[in-house]
A protein has these predicted regions:
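GIY-YIG nuclease catalytic motif and its immediate N-terminal context
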Residues: 1-53, 57-69, 74-81, 98-100, ...
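Short arginine-rich
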Residues: 58, 81-94
């Protein structure tokens, strides 16, 4: 995994080694991916670059639309499992409760914006 301090787009306000649950999407109302990490910047960077082959790279799931910071990794894992068991509409409601426009939040944590899709 890319170390946060080696990250080429690091900004001083980036989230540093904090357990969190995050939701990525391919596009607004598109395919959703729920994950957990202790290094959000590095993990989202990996998803965006396709560094790790799998579900997100196969379906172009690269836009960060929600993340929740938690105190401990066990709490983050429990929250991830909880959200993964929710109905799709509940997940959409969760995203829209704080991000109704489905804006890519990755820019706010230090990553460059995604190129515009045609």
């Amino acid at each position: 995994m890319l170390n946060l301090f080696q990250h080429p787009f690091l900004r001083s306000n980036a989230v540093v080694k904090q357990p969190c649950v995050y939701i990525l999407t391919s596009q607004p109302y598109g395919t959703l991916y729920i994950g957990v990490t202790s290094d959000l910047v590095a993990r989202v960077y990996q998803h965006r670059t396709g560094e790790v082959p799998g579900f997100t790279s196969r379906y172009g799931i690269v836009s960060l639309v929600r993340f929740d910071l938690l105190e401990t990794m066990p709490e983050a894992i429990a929250r991830e499992k909880q959200i993964k068991h929710w109905h799709r509409q509940w997940k959409i409601n969760l995203i829209e409760s704080e991000n109704p426009q489905w804006i890519d939040l990755a820019v706010g944590i230090g990553l460059p914006s995604l190129p515009l899709q045609p």
